[in-house]
Structures are given as C-alpha cells and as structure tokens.
Amino acid sequence: MLDLNIQNETSRLRTVVLGTAFHNGPIPTIEECYDPKSKIHVIAGTYPKEQDMIFEMESVARVFEKYGIKVFRPKVIENYNQIFSRDIGFVIEDKFITANILPDRDLEISAIDHVLGQIPKENRISLPEDCHVEGGDVMPWNNYIFIGTYSGKDYPEYITARTNVNAVKAIQELFPTKIVKSFELRKSNDNAKENALHLDCCFQPIGKDKAILHKNGFLIEEEFLWLVDFFGKENIFEISKDEMYQMNSNVFSISENIIVSEQNFTRLNTWLVEKGFTVEKVTYAEIAKQEGLLRCSTLPLVRD
C-alpha cells in the first residue's frame, strides 16, 4: 500500500505521478480548447507535436530517476490528453482527494486506478459534485492550505475558472486544524496574459521560505500583498506578465534545494542559483503551449 504524505510543496519527493503525452490525440478545434493559450497555438498552427511533448516529458522522468524517485505513469488512453496529472487529484497529508474536473476529462482519473488501488479506501476522498476543484489551485504549505478560486457570479461563463468557493469550504472542513487561505484569481477565456488558469500559474512557494509570484494574477491586491508579507519581499521572485505567460511560476520542487525548471527561464534560473538552489533544467516549451508546465504535469504522492 502507498503511505501518502504531503505536508508542503518542497519536502524531499519520494513518489509521484507524472503525466504522459503518448497517444495524445489530434490537434483540438478552437471550440475544444480548455484555455486561451491552447487556442492561440491552434489558430497559429503552432500547437505542440506529440513526439516533441513525449521527448519533453521523458526528460523529466529521467531527472526523477536520477534522484531515485518512484514514478507512476497513467495508463495510456488512445487519442486522449493525459499530460496534466495535477488536475485530476491532489494529496494533503495522507488523503488523496479526487478532483471534480471538467466532465470531458473524467477518463483521466480511471487511468490511474493502478495507483488509487494502492491507497487505503478511507484515505481516498471524493468531494460533493457541487465542489469544483483542480490540483493546480491547491497548495499545502505546512499549517496552511493555499487555494486559488473564483467567486464571481459569472463563474459558469469561465471555462478557465476551475475551483469554486464550495470546494474551498469543503477542504476547510476536511482539514479543520489547517488554515485555509483562498485567493481570487483573474480569469479570461480569451486572453492568456490576463488569465491565471490555476493558482500555480501566478504563485508557488519554493525552498523553505521563498516564493515565485505574479501580481496581476490576483484579482484582489490585498490578497497579493498578504503573500508578500507572509514570505517577505526579499524572498520573492516577482515575474512579469510575459514570464507568467511562459509559466515561470510552474516549476517543480524535488526538495527544498532542488528545483526542476524550464531551460529558457533565464532570469528565474539565475536568481534560483544565486539563492543556493540546484536547478535541473529541462526543455518544456512545447508542453507550455497548453498553459501548463512542470507542476501541472506532476502529482506528488509521498514527500518526506
């Protein structure tokens, strides 16, 4: 059986689900796109090729192998996008919470049945149907759980709004001893530079006390400033709108001092090295065309 343990975003990783790009399916139509960035690349004819995405994901698998991390992969479903495993579930403490994701993506959950079957039933949780949540919006951080959400009355109109207030309340009830802190995110169905698809598109804690942050991803300035105060301005790497668009905040921590990052994130990677991090650079620019990167395509199950 799997002894799940996730207390935060950066303790030493031991076991993870990494998505797969095999048999990813045809290029979607504009109507089939779930996010504005994918739409841009469908229209431009630059939507990523399957072989390029496979190459990128296997390079991440090799990094995990280098550090002795146990890696699970989803069972491959023909003609189906299974890259972003973070969307389908998440772990807090010893509980696996199945995400209530977009209906078109339900098959993704069945593709990790071989993983879920190793988790005790009492530790597998499905939230009520009216609780919409995806793993990219949920960040355990020791005594806190940070959650990205959108509470506007026009929530149903945004395919980019993935986590609702009902889910925030449900997670607080599941973990009564944790401090659940929610953040209203900026949403756009059409402008990728004005859209924080998930919380990890504009924020991520790294190391012991540092964070990557993009101000415009937050609808309410006070909530952005709360994070600045929480981590301390000197510990924050603030990214520009273009860097947010390129997914700079969506790196992935193997430990408190080892981070997997995209090789083209020059400014961020330089800062990370200056701060004492080991940076494992990979090519992930094709995956990024679907408005997701390294954190989005990983689902940590066990950390120290």
Language-model regions: role of each:
Residues M1-D304:
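The feature marks the mature, well-folded catalytic cores of soluble enzymes
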